[in-house]
Curated annotation (Swiss-Prot):
DOK proteins are enzymatically inert adaptor or scaffolding proteins. They provide a docking platform for the assembly of multimolecular signaling complexes. Plays a role as negative regulator of the mobilization of calcium ions and of calcium signaling. This is Docking protein 3. Residues 145-249 form the IRS-type PTB domain. One of its GO terms (biological process) is Ras protein signal transduction. It comes from Gallus gallus (Chicken).
Length: 426
């Protein structure tokens, strides 16, 4: 209920039939409030100066809005009620002549209620120009650290296993993500960035998947925070900074790279498999094998076919004539090679016969000759060799067509040097 600022008995002057009279009233001054405007309320008063019954005086109440007041001030009159002084109140609708025992107090209260609010409004309008357009500073967050984000843990299987629920503080430190207690700021869980498989953000949700080597174990953790985008950018920046710092080889990585890895070390794709196989036995202090930087291996040429390998090994023995391109494989070497002197051909034929002799069929085998296997460790036979003239002591062997003997001798000698397996003859 509103309380009046000023309450008392005053007199109002009336003119009736050209004669001025004073009528006693009770006046109350109310200031502007959420319940009403600044005003003066008048009630009829009896001779003893008290207000009559409210139910009877409701119809006799008069209201003067002080917002319509134009001027207030004292005035001198010849006749006023006893022990009173006159003052005037001018509004936009009517002029009032009033008298009161405490005239100065009534004038002061009327001026304060009627003109003080207008004066303040005029001063603000005269001195206050239009506000200068300003932009919000997105970096203004001095009340908390930029790397700490208040989060709400959402229920997941990993969060339930770690008994996480409620509000926490997630700090994106240079080397790890740390979950702290919201009250005591004590670190509860730590996830190093190398142990995070993946992370992401969607509106007000930040989520990441932890690996098996982290303190919390394998699983997905989801947090709700209004600064999810900022948190995701902070984690990405920290990972990028840490990755740039690892471009130079670390001492621990160098020590591991010098260890013999076995046959799998030749294949660069074997490193991730080896890291996954031994991840459970390595402690958290050892760096992940996936982080080791192996030097790039130059791609090797595709393995050639068998006869192409044989041809490369025997090309110095079969050189084409000047101006002709090198042959591609063995068969071209054999059939396109330039014939050599007869003495050399006969020597090769003798050597082919000796090598065939070392490859006789095993005991109990019915075939004439077995599959030719290398016999380099066999001792050299002490038999008579061909003379330079193509003859030897003793009975002469029946002659054969030389082109066929030359071709067979070359085939046997070439294949015996490279030692092809049984799969090359299938």
């Amino acid at each position: 209920m509103e309380r009046p600022v000023k309450d008392g008995i005053i007199y109002v002057q009336h003119c009736k039939f050209g004669k001025r009279t004073w009528r006693k009233i009770r006046a109350q001054l109310f200031a502007a409030s959420p319940f009403g405007v600044a005003r003066m309320e008048k009630f009829d008063a009896r001779d003893h100066g008290t207000v009559s019954d409210i139910s009877l005086q409701r119809c006799a109440r008069r209201v003067i809005r002080l917002s319509d007041c134009v001027s207030v001030g004292p005035m001198g009159t010849e006749s006023c009620p006893k022990a009173t002084a006159a003052f005037y109140l001018t509004t936009t609708e009517k002029n009032y002549v009033l008298a009161a025992e405490q005239r100065d107090e009534w004038i002061e209260q009327l001026c304060q209620l009627a003109f003080q609010g207008k004066k303040e409004a005029e001063q603000s309008s005269s001195t206050g120009l239009q506000p200068i357009p300003m932009e919000e500073n997105c970096l203004y967050s001095s009340w908390q650290d930029l790397t700490e984000f208040p989060v709400l843990v959402l229920r997941t299987e990993a969060a339930a296993r770690c008994e996480l629920h409620g509000h926490y503080v997630l700090a994106a430190l240079p080397h790890s993500l740390t979950l702290k207690d919201a009250q005591s700021q004590q670190p509860l869980l730590t996830w190093p960035y190398p142990f995070l498989r993946k992370f992401g953000q969607d509106q007000n949700i930040f989520s990441f998947e932890a690996g098996r080597r982290s303190d919390s174990g394998e699983g997905t953790f989801t947090f709700s925070t209004p600064r999810a985008a900022e948190l995701c950018r902070a984690v990405a920046a920290a990972i990028a900074c840490q990755q740039q710092g690892q471009e130079s080889p670390q001492p621990s990585a160098q020590g591991l790279s010098n260890q013999p890895w076995g046959a799998e070390a030749e294949d660069p794709q074997c490193s991730p498999t080896l890291g996954r196989a031994h991840s459970g036995s390595h402690s958290a202090s050892y760096p992940s094998l996936n982080l080791l930087r192996f030097p790039p291996v130059e791609p090797e040429a595709p393995a050639p076919i068998v006869y192409a390998s044989i041809a490369r090994g025997q090309q110095p023995h079969f050189r084409p004539c000047p101006g002709q391109p090198l042959p591609e494989h063995l068969y071209e070497n054999i059939f396109t090679a330039q014939p050599r002197p007869l003495a050399e051909e006969e020597a090769e034929e003798e050597e082919g016969r000796w090598e065939l002799g070392c490859r006789q069929a095993p005991e109990g085998h019915s075939s004439e000759a077995a599959v030719p296997y290398p016999a380099r460790s066999a001792p050299q036979p002490h038999t008579q060799r061909w003379a330079p003239g193509g003859s030897r002591g003793g009975a002469e062997e029946p002659s054969r067509p030389k082109p066929q003997r030359t071709l067979r001798a070359k085939l046997v000698r070439l294949l015996s040097r490279d030692g092809p397996g049984a799969r090359d003859w299938s």
